[in-house]
Amino acid sequence: MLDIQLLRKDAALVAERLAARGFAFDAARFDALEAERKTIQTRTQDAQSRRNTLSKQIGMLKGKGEDTTAVMAEVGGLGDELKQLETRLSELQAELNDFLMGIPNLPHESVAPGKDETANVEVSRWGTPRQFDFAVRDHVDLGEGLGQLDFAAAVKITGSRFSVMRGGLARLHRALAQFMLDLHTTEHGYTEVYVPYVVNAESMRGTGQLPKFEEDLFHVPRSDADRLYLIPTAEVPVTNLVRDEIVAAEALPLKFVAHTPCFRSEAGSYGRDTRGMIRQHQFDKVELVQMVRPEDSYAALEGLAAHAETVLQRLGLPYRKMALCSGDMGFSAAKTYDLEVWLPAQNTYREISSCSNFEAFQARRMQARFREGQGKPELLHTLNGSGLAVGRTLVAILENYQNADGSITVPEALRPWMGGVERLTPA
């Protein structure tokens, strides 16, 4: 959520910066709400002041033994008026809050302008794509050829965009998550957390999934007032660990890592990536989350992205780092790097991690703050990134480490988590 004081101070500048990310700020709506709020607030304060004056007058009249009937009648009328004014003021505050909830974050000054992914800026590349001396197969053919990836079974059990893995492939999937967790906890200083996979609406609002992205979420059928949601990312429960909290400054930065399944309806991606594991309703991800002082957040973003890059480097997977333009960033982000891994069968790079700094946008929604000594609480800055998406990493390994006979070489970095297995072969 944006700081409403920033809007009150310079709504035109905010509108200009939001336009850079393709968002049309409704200045007329904001001005109308603000004008009525100011009017009602002034009338409320005047009525309260008048009531206080009359209350003192009643005391003086009683002290003199004089009649207070008329004054008390006026006080009673003011009480009714105040009740109405305070009710309307509460309604206006709620309307303003809802209005603010629908506004995305402002892009950082370093973010390139642009409408979509075509304006994203390549920052760096690592690794050289392998040259194959045989016909490259995609991960679906490879997994099914191993007899260890079964989409038909998933369709029978649930429906499309799910998968079933067996044997060595299922073990490789598990090994990837364990490798990532151990790397981030032992070398990068993260604390592993286990969190609920089902969260309430307040948690979704805190990180920015609600109200804008309701259709992208799976929810548990209950009353609308008590609706629960399957998490689309561990970002939601992990970041909400600091909701309504005041963290001691000396405890910062907070760095958490969690491995969870993620659930997304993919409502806006009809017809995209319908084959295979690239875009599924359920997938595993290792998520990195940090809460830091405001002045440290952009250095933290560089570090967080580097932690995700280390996973790809240890696995020997070629990738590129992209700085997203203003129009391609997520709703809550002020700046985002995407890491895109090379997929030989598609002959292109595909997103495998998204690392973002949200500045105080999420913290303001959650009232997540820190305190320096006895000072006034300040809003934290929050960051997160995939470290990595497990399923897409598995896809990248299948395609980059495939052999002519259909077997898959297990990357050396994963072999300790695979019991020393060096190759997956057809069952």
UniProtKB/Swiss-Prot annotation:
It is found in: Cytoplasm. GO terms for cellular component: cytoplasm. It comes from Thiobacillus denitrificans (strain ATCC 25259 / T1). This is Serine--tRNA ligase. Homodimer. The tRNA molecule binds across the dimer. SUPFAM superfamilies: Class II aaRS and biotin synthetases (SSF55681), tRNA-binding arm (SSF46589). Its EC number is 6.1.1.11. Signal peptide: none annotated. GO terms for molecular function: ATP binding; serine-tRNA ligase activity. Keywords: Aminoacyl-tRNA synthetase, ATP-binding, Cytoplasm, Ligase, Nucleotide-binding, Protein biosynthesis. PROSITE patterns: AA_TRNA_LIGASE_II (PS50862). The gene is serS.
